[in-house]
Amino acid sequence: LLLFSSFEVNSSNDLEAAAINIGDKAPDIVLESPDGKVMKLSDLKGQMVLIDFWASWCGPCRRENPNVVRAYNKYSKAKFKNAKGFEIFSVSLDGSKNAWKAAIEADGLVWKYHVSDLKKWNSAAAALYEVRSIPASFLVNAEGIIVAKNLRGNQLDLELDKHIKSL
């Protein structure tokens, strides 16, 4: 039992060491939108970007979506100190395009950047960012560096407020 516990500690430490961390360069995500258009995270360089991993079938994600919508509406026109603006890059872990599109519509996710490979937990983007639970988010600055992770509710506002000149 002691060996097993010891193995578990080492295993989780190894996973933590390999994880995407604050201060790391955000890996590029290149996936298709619901209408089949290829969208790249790197196209948003120069802006503050919230990478938001979610799915239509995820209750906690759907409950968090109103906070994300509110933040988008509040900050999408804000003046930032070192960025051209604020954008959301939503990555869905859905398997059904219809369910994904319906959730975007139902939850009022009005921003342009919605992507998925419709592979659920086998999503290339989820693997790249080592996402093991959703909702998960990464705030990326204008230089493409991750400045915060897993911001929910007013935590997103508090972090974005550090980077704005005026609303």
Where are these regions (language model features)?
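Hydrophobic h-region of N-terminal signal peptides that target proteins for export
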Residues: 2-8
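N-terminal "domain-start" segment that seeds a small globular fold
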Residues: 10-42, 161, 165-166
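Conserved Rossmann-like nucleotide-binding pocket used by diverse enzymes
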Residues: 27, 40, 51-54, 89, ...
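Short active-site neighborhood of thiol/selenol oxidoreductases, capturing the structured segment around
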Residues: 40-62
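Alpha/beta-hydrolase fold active-site loops
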Residues: 48-49, 86, 135
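Conserved helix-turn-beta segment immediately C-terminal to the redox Cys motif
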Residues: 63-90, 162
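Short, internal strand/loop/helix patches
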Residues: 89, 94-96, 101-138, 142
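Thiol-/selenol-based redox modules, centered on thioredoxin-like
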Residues: 134, 139-167
